[in-house]
């Protein structure tokens, strides 16, 4: 659900350039099959970060690889380690990476991220989280020791279509436990302590922070 004024949303969509064949196909498949992928603007932000940093990325939540492709296309020496629990979606993603010519920059690790993160070596320069919303804070806590000093954290869906601002008990599109998890994480990222960050009204709301 858009969190911006519809006129602004329409204007931003009109600015989008033509997508590569692989990316356009992924968008069509996601819409057809109901696969959750990031908004294009979110992918573009990740792409710009990867272009600037050329990081080693840890991504929690591959789905069919749409956000992964945005990042991998911009890497030279960097790479993406992406975690996905759904084997069928992981296989779909591999096919897209091969066709887009970025398979050598991406490693897909299958399984529950709460279990697979422990086996990763790191260190990572960028952590991107877009998976089960109620588990966001657990993913971050598990991955944090594997991040470099001053690593960047990016988290998707933190405004949840604006539902995080709805009064408790109001009818919303998101479950209350997901909303509660997002509210706590937003406070942690913005309020200081372990992270210096903010929540941006981009896509469905993106948290951007760095370790302090």
What does each of the following model-derived ranges do?
Residues 1-126, 133-154, 158-212:
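A short alpha-helical cap/connector motif
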